[in-house]
Amino acid sequence: MIMLVKEFGAQHTWKRNITAMNAHRANSTPLLSSLLILLALIFLSTACTAPGGSTSSTFSPRTHPQAAATQPPAMVHIPSGPITYVALGASDAVGVGSDQPGSQGYVPLVAAHLPKGSHLVNLGITGERLHDALTEELPIALSTSPGLITVWLVANDFVDGVSYDAYIHDLNTLLEQLHTNSRASLVMANLPDLTRLPAFASLTSTQKAQMLAQIKRWNTGIATSAAHYSVRLVDLFNHGSQLTAHPEYISGDGFHPSPAGYVQLANIFWLAIQG
């Protein structure tokens, strides 16, 4: 946890624990290792594709809920008075790539738009995957009586080689819990076009095409789950070029936003929140 707009009182155990997790994961598995795993899984998934483009996998309703085609976009209601804003996420929520994560990340920048006196609970953990967030972030989020929850937990799962089926199952578990056990407005981001980032510049055109196809597949599943659980979607895939088209918006690691990039990212989130 990196910041609270207004403290909830004494230092909380969960605050200390999340700070420790971020410090521990700061030197986690290098991006190159994750990329190699990702490419191997993309190759396997492509090789297992049945004629006609369909895969051999079968999806149960629990894994891949069906949303009504005519279902309108989820509504986000921001009251005029103070609210508690909870951010579930990974290194981008922490603000990795910025000079001052506590104030320059997209989460505190989004929080700055909220009514005066609102509370920010940033549960972002560097290197976090969605499955881990079910036990490390979700219980805390539900305990804070939030009015707004943002979720961006997908890039690490995708790059680290988590299977599509496992990710969608965990995503539905998360969204079902948030939808059932809170009255918060829910906002969630999808995968941007990672092939446009400098970190993946060494990929061949074929590898980029395969990676892009998998990103689109994941985003289709994310959109279906978002519609099913009345979650407002932040479409970073279609709006991400606002970041990738400007080298100054990407940090030196070629993967995370720079301070200027986080400003743009926060604007994309806020526009989606406003509807």
Where do the model's predicted regions map?
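Bacterial signal peptide processing site
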Residues: 49-51
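Methionine residue identity
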Residues: 1-3
